[in-house]
């Protein structure tokens, strides 16, 4: 068996053409959703890496503005008294948004303290992670394991304590055979999201 590259020069040109097209769409499309998977912060994540690869200053300036607009859209949610559990998912909620901020900081795309933005809602998000485990919602996108990923990237003691509690709750469910009845083994919503 001989080795051959997955991407030929011709294919790379087609891929870059599509990437440029996606970047243009993201840059010129407004969304009222500030979240990760279907909203602005996901677009911004793509665009920051796009700018890093291409060195496109115009896109970088617009992406930076989009980032601050996204933070502004998020502020009302961060100061709300409503039930955060419904807004805690990784896919379309505050844990995905917080993960993105932590990722940007770790990659030195942004600077600052994530706690300044997320600190008021973190306790509620982390409690909802435990609630999800206790109610058999383990999935990555909408359940406990996505919130756990957010916790893994946080350097603070509070998040680590909740991760320990997450593992303990999961261990209790495994020991009492509570995972045996699950029929959802998918990554996004089921047990595979844990691994």
PLM regions and their residue ranges:
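Solvent-exposed loop and edge beta-strand segments that line ligand/cofactor-binding
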Residues: 23-41, 77-94, 130-142, 177-192
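Short sequence/structural elements of tandem HEAT/ARM alpha-solenoid repeats
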Residues: 61-64, 112-119, 161-168
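Post-signal peptide N-terminal segment of secreted/secretory-pathway proteins
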Residues: 55-88, 92-94, 98-109
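Alpha-helical solenoid scaffolds that mediate protein-protein interactions
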Residues: 22, 26, 50, 63, ...
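Low-complexity, Ser/Thr/Pro/Gly-enriched N-terminal "stalk/linker" regions
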Residues: 1-65
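Solenoidal tandem-repeat scaffolds enriched in leucines and small polar residues
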Residues: 138-195
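Well-ordered mid-protein domain cores that form the structural environment of catalytic cofactors
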Residues: 94-131
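Well-ordered alpha-helical scaffold segments within catalytic/enzyme domains
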Residues: 1-4, 42-56, 96-110, 146-158, ...
